[in-house]
Each structure stands twice: as C-alpha cells, then as structure tokens.
C-alpha cells in the first residue's frame, strides 16, 4: 500500500489580484538550480511571486519586474523543512507556509507538520504552529475575510484552523467526511469563498464544500456536484467572489475555472497541456501563473531505470485569465 508520505508528493496549495498590466509581466518565471521540486506558489500586492520548494526546504521569491526566482527564506529558518503550500495574506502582511519533515516511505515524520508565519515584506519569521493530529502533512492554506487561517492535513484528511489572534491550530473539519485516511485520498488544495471553505482530494478527484457557521464552526461537509469531472486536482485559488482557479494534474495537465454556487459547480477549461505536472496557480492582475513541480522525477522508485532525459528548468508559465 502506498504510504501517506509518498502519496502526498503526487499532490506536489493565493493572493489578491494586482493592478499590473499584462504586457509588463513575463511569460515564464524560472527557478534556477537542480532538484527544486516546487509544490506551491502565491503572490503579493507588490507584484512578487513566492514559491515553496520540497527538496531544497526553502522559499523563493520573484521580485516585481523579474522573471527569475531567488532564495528568499533559506532552509532551516526557524526550523523550516520540506516546504509545500504557501499563501500570501496581504491584509496582515503575512506569508503562511506549510512545512513537513518527510522521511522514507512508510516511516512516520520525525517532526509533525507545521504551519509557519513569515513577514510578507522582510521574510522574517513571526511564529509557527504544530498540527494538532499526529503524523500530519501540511499541504495548502487559505484565509477567510475575518483573518482565520485554514490548512489541509493530507495524511489525516482534515482541515485545521488557526483562529484570528489564536496561538494553536485546531481540527476544524474531517472525521472521515473527506474520505478515510487509510484510503489515501490526499486532501490537497483549499480556498475560501465568502462563508464557505472549498477543498479538493487529489487521488479521488473530488471537490468538497464546508459552510462556515455564524459561530465560526464547520457546517456539514458536502461533495460539490460538478457539471463534468475534474482529474487529479491540486492547488486552487479563489478568483472573484464565486469562482476558483484550479490546476489538474490528470489527463496531461490543465488549468480550469469553476463557477461555484454552494454545492454545485460549472467547470471551464482555460488551458490544457502541462506535461511536467501542474501543482499550483496564482494570479497577478489578469495573468495566472501555473507552476509545474516535476514531481514524477522526485517520486522515481529506488532501483528504477535511470532517467537519461536532460534536466528541465523549473518554471511557472503565464496564461491570461482576465478579470474575475
């Protein structure tokens, strides 16, 4: 049986739109170096694009006007490890990041999943919060209008929450509602639209919605009924008041837009053809950047034939999405 740690790497998570003209933005953002294996990207209102790396255990930033990422938050900063989801909360000047210490398949992490908070301008560490359930894997992050932070725990199939002003994470939704942990459904991408949290499962290709109650507690989890199937969904971001942009790693990879109305949704394909495995998307003005993680290379089994293909650059590519 595939281990939760090995499975999550198949998953590989937002920011406010920027008032930046599409013509001023590069077509490709490159992350120099080998074995970067990025899992998520986000963007801030100054035009920066921020990228997390699984293997290098650090966070990169593409400065406004540049097309090349530079190391911004080095590995080991305040204990930062394998970096998955990143999310820029511009309202609080905070970059949230998922950190995991991954070991060999079948071996529990030596350190439980941790949600980090960094200063969005300086990169200085603000705080970190350990996941409440053991053997957790922090995958992706979203923030609601009140400032509450939500993150997906892939291995435990839970959504955890950090209340605004809180000092500890708590389990907010789960209890088998997204699938049993033993089934390795991989709870992955997450986004907030109004008073609803949306989350997807990579391996079972499902999208779920959870109402946020007036008291902040989670309502009943429901699977979103889509007008056509999605395939291996990964990172997604809120796009306007009622839509999400979502990357799908199945069927050759694609970027889709889903118009949501509670527990129903209409899927529109924006672009197809991401052969290196799309893992995340962020929006800068009217431009979306789709990040490809090349995680199939990272997941090559021990003893498998050597890959003689020349290394490809790690990159995020632009696609016009217009205004929400």
Which residue stretches match the model-derived regions?
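Asp-box/WD-like beta-propeller blade repeats and closely related beta-sheet repeat scaffolds
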Residues: 109-146
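A short helix->beta-strand "capping" segment at the edge of beta-propeller domains
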Residues: 23-36, 319-322
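Short loop/turn segments that connect beta-strands within beta-propeller blades
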Residues: 63-67, 119-124, 163-167, 211-216, ...
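A short loop-to-beta-strand structural motif that recurs across blades of beta-propeller domains
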Residues: 58-60, 113-116, 158-161, 206-208, ...
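Beta-propeller blade signature
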Residues: 111-121, 305-323
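Conserved beta-strand positions in repeat-built beta-propeller and related beta-rich domains
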Residues: 50-55, 89, 95-110, 149-155, ...
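A short beta-strand motif characteristic of beta-propeller blades
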Residues: 25-31, 68-76, 124-131, 170-182, ...
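Beta-rich, blade/repeat-based domains predominating
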Residues: 32-49, 54, 77-101, 131-149, ...
């Amino acid at each position: 049986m595939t281990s939760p740690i090995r499975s999550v790497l198949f998953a590989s998570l937002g920011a406010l739109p920027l008032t930046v003209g599409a013509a001023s933005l590069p077509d490709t953002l490159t992350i120099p170096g080998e074995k970067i294996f990025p899992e998520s990207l986000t963007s801030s209102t100054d035009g920066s694009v921020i990228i997390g790396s699984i293997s290098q255990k650090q966070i990169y930033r593409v400065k406004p006007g540049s097309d090349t990422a530079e190391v911004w938050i080095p590995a080991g900063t305040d204990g930062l490890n394998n970096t998955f989801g990143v999310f820029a909360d511009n309202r609080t000047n905070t970059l949230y990041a998922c950190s995991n210490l991954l070991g060999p398949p079948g071996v529990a992490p030596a350190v439980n999943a941790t949600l980090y908070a960094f200063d969005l301008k300086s990169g200085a560490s603000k705080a970190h919060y350990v996941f409440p359930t053991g053997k957790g894997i922090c995958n992706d992050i979203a923030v609601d209008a009140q400032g509450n932070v939500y993150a997906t725990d892939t291995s435990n199939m839970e959504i955890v929450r950090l209340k605004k002003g809180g000092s500890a994470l708590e389990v907010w939704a789960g209890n088998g509602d997204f699938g049993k942990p033993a089934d390795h459904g991989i709870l992955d991408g997450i986004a907030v639209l109004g008073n609803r949290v949306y989350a997807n499962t990579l391996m079972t290709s499902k999208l779920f919605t959870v109402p946020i109650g007036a008291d902040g507690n989670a309502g009943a989890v429901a699977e979103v009924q889509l007008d056509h199937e999605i395939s291996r969904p990964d990172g997604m971001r809120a796009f306007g008041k009622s839509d999400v942009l979502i990357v799908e790693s199945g069927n050759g990879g694609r970027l889709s837009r889903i118009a949501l109305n509670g527990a129903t949704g209409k899927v529109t394909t924006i672009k197809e053809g991401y052969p290196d495995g799309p893992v995340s998307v962020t929006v800068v003005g009217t431009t979306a950047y789709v990040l490809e993680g090349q995680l199939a290379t990272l997941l090559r089994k021990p003893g498998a034939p050597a890959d003689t293909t020349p290394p490809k650059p790690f990159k995020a590519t632009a696609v016009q999405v217009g205004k929400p």
